[in-house]
């Protein structure tokens, strides 16, 4: 997972990409429907704590606040379901899938628990080698991650070539680099293959 329509970017994935030595070959958009799970016989009024992965919590945050329940971040959604089945406490609930409810013999206390129904997560499929594709093929996105120091006009100098060569940037995000606050890392998605003529000129600039 790389980003979600409600919770935004998945920071852990973005941090891992530059050092992974893997190539992005496809993207996949998956509609996410969260469920509020509890042990058999539990009711929402019994719940005091709701556990899930940080993305699950973020995507259901308004619902949790409205219920006035404590949020507890766990390693993943399925693991949260497993944990509450082991705790066997009516005061603990989890945000997870219907499949997790079936596997761990839990009740679904509320279906579609996410804050909005339009909840979509974008996934990247990655592998060691690039696909053999004609560089001039349309409908190709390329992802670029780069690091710059915080100096005047540095971002313009990095990205100006995209404008002058007609390459459309579809996504641009910045986040602090581990080296410190004077270094920024940028995550960029743009249209075109790295070997496309216009893209090559943009990258050379």
What are these regions (language model features)?
Residues 2-205:
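Domain-level signature for soluble enzymes in the chorismate/prephenate branch of the shikimate pathway
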């Amino acid at each position: 997972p790389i980003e979600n329509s409600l919770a935004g970017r998945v920071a852990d994935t973005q941090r891992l990409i530059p050092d992974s030595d893997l190539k992005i070959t496809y993207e996949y958009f998956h509609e996410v429907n969260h469920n509020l799970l509890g042990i058999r016989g539990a009711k929402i009024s019994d719940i005091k704590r709701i556990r899930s992965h940080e993305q699950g919590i973020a995507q259901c945050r308004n619902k949790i606040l409205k219920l006035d329940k404590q949020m507890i971040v766990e390693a993943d959604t399925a693991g949260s379901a497993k944990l509450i089945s082991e705790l066997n406490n009516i005061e603990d609930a989890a945000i997870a899938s219907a499949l997790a409810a079936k596997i761990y013999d839990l009740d679904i206390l509320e279906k579609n628990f996410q804050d909005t129904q339009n909840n979509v997560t974008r996934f990247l499929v990655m592998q060691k080698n690039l696909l053999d594709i004609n560089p001039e093929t349309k409908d190709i996105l390329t992802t670029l991650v780069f690091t710059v120091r915080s100096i005047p006009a540095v971002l313009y100098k990095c990205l100006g070539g995209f404008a002058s060569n007609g390459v459309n940037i579809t996504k641009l995000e910045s986040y602090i680099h581990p080296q410190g606050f004077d270094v920024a890392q940028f995550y960029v998605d743009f249209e075109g293959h790295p070997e496309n003529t216009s893209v090559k000129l943009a990258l050379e600039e």
